[in-house]
């Protein structure tokens, strides 16, 4: 894998002249250049550059991508990289991402153009995944370093990393090991080359040695700066998700369009009501429309007063507020059947201000088509002419209004704009009901609903439904019909095992969407050993990816064995073990999540349409977006806008949405945010192409967690 390399030195002036860069740009002391807030990504189609572009997409940071494998692609030259605007030199990109430290052929004019550009304008370069070699500021990995897998290894942010771009992390950077039988990582660990100006930001132990090798570090040379990454990753792996923010902050100097935060919200459905219980003998849920066994007797699961105390104590301990989606009929019926007594409702109402509340309709009725439940699975009932029979507008409106009226009379701190229908009904549900109930949009309008919870597993994209925007919610795979761990595991086994193993065979019939377990889980240990780790990892993955969508569970998960808490604690405790205090979990209510999703979509649309202009000149940042589209920016602490403080603090930076009226917005950076000075003398060193690097199959395609090792 090692290659012998020779270098050739050229004076900066000679190289710039040869490339035809605008006169005077090598000496920027006369007129400070304009640097556009856009990233250039040169891709080889590999997972590392794809991961970085995915992070830029999530944040809303604009970039131009050039795929080296595409015929007829854009040639990288001086004219492509820089020009002059109104007499001022302009750098068209604030940062460059390459697949490695030199992905071009020997003697490449494109690599020379990039090197000259970076030096001239002080533009940083990210080597997304490169071999450890002297040309990247490191000793050759084959000479006392390490080349191989790092599955399960606990890397760490160095002191320099914490003081620099990775100050939002607490220290540990654990590498995934989802399946011991699959290689999910590969890295080249090494130490700085002799005489190299290299600072490691993230490192790991070199196997068999007492020293640690760099995984991410900054190499300063020839008037240029490179972030050298010597391990491969994909956009879903935890090790990348932890470092993604820092990579973007390093390459942009903390000045860029777009922003990300880490969100986590938990909706608890069916509060005040009860949920039907899984029957391990009948393998169905008595009381549910799909359980037609004549011997099926419902055995409901309902919270009690002690569960309320546990929930409020948990909220205080974790710093997260639960959103309770309530059905008032649950307590109305409970009091009617028990001489006015409902200890659960009394406890919840006594602590009502400690929760957020969402209207979940009065009776949890199905609000789509009229269901024919005489068949399994159910189907939509039809009129005499064969058309679908829909739940009427009056019924939908009554469900919404009656529940709201009860909540208001009980003094619940409601947001009347929010609604979650029972089972997300009214909206389309495949295969039985392929379209929305046409009466739903009108009912939403009549009741002032603008934020409507939906099921992310059915419809992951936000959409408009009448006056409302949907808020897709992630279902947590802790079943609504299980109050005890043994019940959860029994139903899990029924769904995910083959018929020959006593299961339903659903996984056999639907291999594209469901994977069969190799064997049934132990009902005593399977929940803690497999289900909790899987659900924790999934939810934590959403959190680490900057996804604001909420997760939903059911009130049955907060009682009896309190099945939800091991998952929720795993997510929040796991998060806090990885992140510094300046990067807390952001816990929004549903309406605010919907607004965040809407703003992101509008911002992405504006970026793709080329409707956003943003650049930096010295310590002034100018951003102009289309009228009515909020502008997203991330800037250093101390930034001001019109003399007032800008944004809110998160992860050591300031970020925020600013409403746009279509005119330029000017922000002033603090004096500490000095742009990297361009080099004006010395030589540039041309290097040979970077050696090939290994990319395991377990990185190309994300490996499912076996959760059993």
Model-derived regions: residue spans:
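Secretory targeting and sorting signals
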Residues: 1-28
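Catalytic grooves of carbohydrate-active enzymes
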Residues: 221, 231-234, 248-277, 401, ...
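Active-site-adjacent pocket scaffolds in enzyme catalytic domains
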Residues: 138-139, 190-203, 208, 212-224, ...
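An acidic, glycine-rich "communication" segment
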Residues: 29, 123-206, 627
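Extracellular ligand-binding/catalytic regions of CAZymes and related secreted enzymes
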Residues: 30-32, 213-214, 218-318, 561-593, ...
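C-terminal domain-boundary segment and adjacent tail
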Residues: 67, 244-265, 309-330, 408-410, ...
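Helical hinge/lid and interdomain linker segments adjacent to catalytic or ligand-binding clefts
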Residues: 40-128, 133-135
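Metal-dependent polysaccharide deacetylase catalytic core of the NodB/CE4 family, i.e.
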Residues: 38, 101, 118-121, 128-141, ...
């Amino acid at each position: 894998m090692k290659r012998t390399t020779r270098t050739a030195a050229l004076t900066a002036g000679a190289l710039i002249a040869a490339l035809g860069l605008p006169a005077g740009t090598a000496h920027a002391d006369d007129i400070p250049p304009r640097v556009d807030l856009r990233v250039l990504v040169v891709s080889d189609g590999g997972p590392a550059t794809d991961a970085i572009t995915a992070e830029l997409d999530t944040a809303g940071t604009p970039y131009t991508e050039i795929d080296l494998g595409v015929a007829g692609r854009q040639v990288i030259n001086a004219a492509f990289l820089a020009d002059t605007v109104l007499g001022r030199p302009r750098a068209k990109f604030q940062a460059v991402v390459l697949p490695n430290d030199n992905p071009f052929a020997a003697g490449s004019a494109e690599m020379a153009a990039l090197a000259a550009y970076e030096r001239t304008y002080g533009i940083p370069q990210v080597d997304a995944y490169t071999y450890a070699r002297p040309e990247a500021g490191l000793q050759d990995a084959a000479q006392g370093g390490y080349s191989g897998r790092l599955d399960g290894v606990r890397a760490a942010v160095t002191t320099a990393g914490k003081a620099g771009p990775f100050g939002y992390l607490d220290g540990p950077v654990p590498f995934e090991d989802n399946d011991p039988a699959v290689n999910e990582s590969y890295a080249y660990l090494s130490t700085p080359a002799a005489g190299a100006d290299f600072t490691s930001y993230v490192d790991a132990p070199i196997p068999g040695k007492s020293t640690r090798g760099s995984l991410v570090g900054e190499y300063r040379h020839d008037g240029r700066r490179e972030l050298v990454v010597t391990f491969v990753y994909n956009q879903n792996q935890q090790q990348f998700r932890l470092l993604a923010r820092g990579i973007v902050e390093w390459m942009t100097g903390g000045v860029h369009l777009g922003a990300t935060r880490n969100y986590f919200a938990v909706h608890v459905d069916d509060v005040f009501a009860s949920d039907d219980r899984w029957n391990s003998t009948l393998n169905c849920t008595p009381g549910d429309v799909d359980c037609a066994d004549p011997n099926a007797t419902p055995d409901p699961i309902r919270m009690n007063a002690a569960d309320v105390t546990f929930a409020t104590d948990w909220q205080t301990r974790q710093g997260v507020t639960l959103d309770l989606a309530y059905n008032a009929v649950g307590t109305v019926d409970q009091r009617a059947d028990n001489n006015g007594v409902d200890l659960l409702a009394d406890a919840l109402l006594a602590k009502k201000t400690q929760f957020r509340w969402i209207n979940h309709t009065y009776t949890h009725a199905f609000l789509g088509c009229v269901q024919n439940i005489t068949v399994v699975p159910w189907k939509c009932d039809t009129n005499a002419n064969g058309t679908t029979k829909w739940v009427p507008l009056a019924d939908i409106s009554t469900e919404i209004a009656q529940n709201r009226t009860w909540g208001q009379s009980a003094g619940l701190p409601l947001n009347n704009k929010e609604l979650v229908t029972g089972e997300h009904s009214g909206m389309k549900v495949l295969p039985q009901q392929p379209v929305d109930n046409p009466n739903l949009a009108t009912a939403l309008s009549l009741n002032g609903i603008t934020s409507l919870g939906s099921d992310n597993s059915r419809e992951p994209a936000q959409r408009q439904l009448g006056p409302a925007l949907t808020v897709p919610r992630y279902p947590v795979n802790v079943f609504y019909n299980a109050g005890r761990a043994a019940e959860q595991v029994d139903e899990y086994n029924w769904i995910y095992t083959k018929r020959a193993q006593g299961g339903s065979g659903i996984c056999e019939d639907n291999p594209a969407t469901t994977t069969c377990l190799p064997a049934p889980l132990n009902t005593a240990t399977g929940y803690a050993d497999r289900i909790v780790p899987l659900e924790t990892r999934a939810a934590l993955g959403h959190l680490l990816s900057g996804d604001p969508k909420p997760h939903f569970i059911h009130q049955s998960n907060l009682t009896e064995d309190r099945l939800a808490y091991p998952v929720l604690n795993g997510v929040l405790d796991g998060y806090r073990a990885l992140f510094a205090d300046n990067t807390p979990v952001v816990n929004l209510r549903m309406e605010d999540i919907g607004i965040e999703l809407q703003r992101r979509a509008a911002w992405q649309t504006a970026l793709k349409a080329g409707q956003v202009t943003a650049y930096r000149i010295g310590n002034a940042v100018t951003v102009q977006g289309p009228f009515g589209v909020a502008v997203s920016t991330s800037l250093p602490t101390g930034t001001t806008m019109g003399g007032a403080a800008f944004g809110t603090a998160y992860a050591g930076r300031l970020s925020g949405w600013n409403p746009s009226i279509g005119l330029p917005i000017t922000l002033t950076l603090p004096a500490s945010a000095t742009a990297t000075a361009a080099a004006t003398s010395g030589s540039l060193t041309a290097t040979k192409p970077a050696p090939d690097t290994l990319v395991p199959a377990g990185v190309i395609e994300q490996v499912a967690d076996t959760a059993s090792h």
